[in-house]
């Protein structure tokens, strides 16, 4: 009963979000109807005995509701868009890493029937696993998921936020650049620039990664080489000096 009450509160919250985002009553009604389908599915799962797979399915319906709200908001802003259910193309292998070959094949088939629209919406981290169960990407950073999505959709570049507080920008340039190799050296030094597996994947498909710290400070990682001057300096705290004394023992 408590869960059902919480679910009703969630449905009411969705209605409030639609009221605040949308001005068209017709658009609100259509969005509410589509959201209701997913809420009913969540209710059905909650009435059964949820196991870990059911829990994933509940979260998947929540992700689709978020996509629907965004889609209807963009429609009202006259921005044509289309929702892609990431479970229809994204899959993890037995090693819990994305099965890139499988994903690319699915994307190619999916895009044949996809409307010609400028904006495609999908769900972050939602996928299927090797056993065809609803699952989620390992929590290793949204930038890695974005890199995988960009790679399989043949994107020229992806844009994500730079969350590390260890990165400080100096100088007048608004956009700084690093090559893939320079970025790897940065990451190897211990700086949390982005997930290490992003770089080799982006390099393989020739895709740039743009990291934004503030609207004025961006960092672009690509194959492009720019200049020979020093681009970055790494300063680490807690350096330990270790003195070794030989005991003369062989």
PLM features: residue spans?
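C-terminal catalytic "cap/lid" subdomain
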Residues: 1-2, 6-12, 16-29, 40-51, ...
């Amino acid at each position: 009963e408590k869960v059902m009450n919480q679910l009703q509160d969630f449905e009411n919250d969705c209605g409030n979000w639609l009221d605040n985002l949308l001005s068209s009553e017709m658009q609100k009604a259509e969005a509410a109807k589509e959201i209701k389908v997913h809420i009913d599915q969540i209710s059905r799962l909650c009435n059964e005995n949820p196991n870990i797979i059911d829990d994933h399915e509940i979260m998947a319906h929540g992700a689709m509701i978020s996509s629907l709200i965004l889609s209807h908001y963009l429609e009202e802003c006259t921005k044509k868009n289309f929702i892609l259910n990431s479970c229809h193309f994204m899959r993890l292998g037995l090693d819990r890493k994305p099965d890139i070959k499988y994903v690319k094949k699915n994307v190619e088939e999916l895009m044949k029937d996809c409307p010609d629209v400028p904006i495609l919406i999908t769900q972050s981290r939602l996928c299927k696993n090797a056993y065809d169960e609803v699952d989620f990407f390992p929590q290793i950073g949204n930038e890695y998921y974005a890199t995988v999505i960009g790679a399989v959709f043949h994107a020229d570049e992806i844009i994500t936020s730079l969350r590390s507080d260890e990165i400080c920008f100096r100088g007048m340039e608004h956009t700084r650049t690093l090559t893939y190799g320079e970025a790897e050296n940065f990451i190897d030094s211990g700086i949390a620039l982005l997930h290490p597996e992003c770089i080799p994947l982006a390099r393989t498909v020739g895709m740039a990664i743009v990291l934004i710290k503030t609207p004025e400070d961006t960092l672009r990682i690509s194959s492009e080489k720019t200049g020979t001057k020093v681009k970055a300096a790494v300063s680490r705290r807690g350096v330990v000096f270790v003195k070794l004394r030989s005991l003369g023992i062989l």
